[in-house]
């Protein structure tokens, strides 16, 4: 009985983690500004701000 209870708790934890990560993926796919909730809008670059650190990143 203890094993079934433990398996149920583990399955619940895995389901909650998957639900949370899929929600984040869904929000980022449609509007990346929700990743930064304090930002009111605008473009979020996916590269570091100028000046680049040495050595320069390979693209």
UniProtKB/Swiss-Prot annotation:
A single GO cellular-component term on record: extracellular region
Entries under InterPro entries matching the protein: Histatin/statherin, Statherin
GO BP: any one term: regulation of bone mineralization
Principal subcellular localisation of the protein: secreted
Keywords in alphabetical order: Biomineralization, Phosphoprotein, Secreted, Signal
Stretches of the chain forming a coiled coil according to its record: none
Signal peptide (UniProt feature, chain positions): 1-19
GO molecular function: hydroxyapatite binding
Location in the cell: Secreted
UniProt modified residues of type Phosphoserine: 21-22
Family: Belongs to the histatin/statherin family.
Job description of the protein: Salivary protein that stabilizes saliva supersaturated with calcium salts by inhibiting the precipitation of calcium phosphate salts. It also modulates hydroxyapatite crystal formation on the tooth surface.
PANTHER family hit by this protein: STATHERIN
Protein name per Swiss-Prot or TrEMBL: Statherin
């Amino acid at each position: 009985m203890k094993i079934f209870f433990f398996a149920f708790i583990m399955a619940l934890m895995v389901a909650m983690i998957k639900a949370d990560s899929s929600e984040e993926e869904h929000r980022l796919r449609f509007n990346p500004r929700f990743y930064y909730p304090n930002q009111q809008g605008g473009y979020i670059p996916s590269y570091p701000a100028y000046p680049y650190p040495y050595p320069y990143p390979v693209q």
